[in-house]
Amino acid sequence: MSTPTLPDMVAPSPRVRVKDRCRRMMGDLRLSVIDQCNLRCRYCMPEEHYTWLPRQDLLSVKEISAIVDVFLSVGVSKVRITGGEPLIRPDLPEIVRTLSAKVGEDSGLRDLAITTNGVLLADRVDGLKAAGMKRITVSLDTLQPERFKAISQRNSHDKVIAGIKAVAAAGFTDTKIDTTVMRGANHDELADLIEFARTVNAEVRFIEYMDVGGATHWAWEKVFTKANMLESLEKRYGRIEPLPKHDTAPANRYALPDGTTFGIIASTTEPFCATCDRSRLTADGLWLHCLYAISGINLREPLRAGATHDDLVETVTTGWRRRADRGAEQRLAQRERGVFLPLSTLKADPHLEMHTRGG
C-alpha cells in the first residue's frame, strides 16, 4: 500500500467538541511557525545564542494546513500564529493564505490572528492583509528607545513603532498591543502606553511577568501585579470599571472613565487554568497542552509516516481527554518560587523554551 499524500489525509470529518479531565473544551490553538527571533528580550530570550530546531523538522505549509484541519475537527475555532518571530519565516504569506481560506462556518474557524514583535511589520503588513490575516497583536514593552534597547538587547524601537502605525494605516481592527510589565523596567509607563494605543486604534494588554521557560532572570520582586497596575492607573485616571467577561480569553478588560478600554493578563498572580481552552503546536509539530508543560505529543512523526486525518483526530482527541494541566496554578502554589527551568536544562531541550512554544 502506498503512503497517503497530504491531500488524501485531510478529508473532512464531523466536528466534535472535546473536554479534558477538568471539563475544559478545546477552542484555541497557538501555532508557532518558527522558533527563531530577531530580538533578545530579557524576559524570554536573554541569551545571545540558542539551539534552534532542525530546519528539516519544521512543518511545511501543507503539513501545517493538515494539522490545523485536525484541530478544527475537534473544536478549535481560533488560531493564532506565533513564533519565535513569525515574520522571519519566508513563506508566512502562503501560510496565512492557506489558513485564512479556512475561516468560515463550514470549518468552524472564526478567528485568525498573529502575534509579532513588530520589527519587520511595516514592510510586511500589506502582504499580511492581502493574504487574509484578520487581526494583529504587536508586542511593545516601552515607548522609550533606550529602555527598549535595554529590554530587547536590540536597537529596533523605531521599527516597532512604525510597524504599529502601519497596522492602523492598513485598516486592521481589533488590534492589540501586548506589554510585559516588569517592576523597575517599565511599570511607570502604563498610562503612556494606553495613550499611545488610542492614537493607533489599538487596545493595550498589560501582562504580568511570567516565570516560563526562557525567563531565567525571573524573580517575584520584579512582578508588577494586576493589583499594582490598577492602583497605578486609578491614580492617573480615577475610577476604573471592570468589563464583563464573555469568553475564555486570558485578559480581564477594564474601562477608563472616558470609555477607553485596556486589558490585564494576570497569569502569575491570578491564573486562568480553570477556563484555559488553549494548546500550543511548536514549529516542528510538538503539541503542548500547557505553557508550563515539560513534554508533549509529536504530531509531525505520524503525519510524515502516513497517518490519516482521522488517525490524527483520534490522537488529538485522546490526548485532550487526558489533559489535566494546571501549570500556572501549580507554580503559584509553590512556597519557594524561583526560576522555572535552569539555563542548562533549557539548552538541552529547545522545546522547553518560551520562544519555541509561543506565548
From Swiss-Prot:
It is an enzyme of class 4 (lyase). It catalyses: GTP + AH2 + S-adenosyl-L-methionine = (8S)-3',8-cyclo-7,8-dihydroguanosine 5'-triphosphate + 5'-deoxyadenosine + L-methionine + A + H(+). [4Fe-4S] cluster 2 binds at C273, C276, C290. Disulfide bonds: none annotated. Pathway: Cofactor biosynthesis; molybdopterin biosynthesis. One of its GO terms (molecular function) is GTP binding. Its cofactor is [4Fe-4S] cluster. Gene3D superfamilies: Aldolase class I. Keywords: 4Fe-4S, GTP-binding, Iron, Iron-sulfur, Lyase, Metal-binding, Molybdenum cofactor biosynthesis, Nucleotide-binding, S-adenosyl-L-methionine. Pfam families: Mob_synth_C (PF06463), Radical_SAM (PF04055). Transmembrane segments: none annotated. GO terms for biological process: Mo-molybdopterin cofactor biosynthetic process. Monomer and homodimer. NCBIfam families: moaA. PANTHER family: MOLYBDENUM COFACTOR BIOSYNTHESIS PROTEIN 1, MOLYBDOPTERIN COFACTOR SYNTHESIS PROTEIN A. Catalyzes the cyclization of GTP to (8S)-3',8-cyclo-7,8-dihydroguanosine 5'-triphosphate. This is GTP 3',8-cyclase 1. The lineage of its organism: Bacteria, Bacillati, Actinomycetota, Actinomycetes, Mycobacteriales. The gene is moaA1.
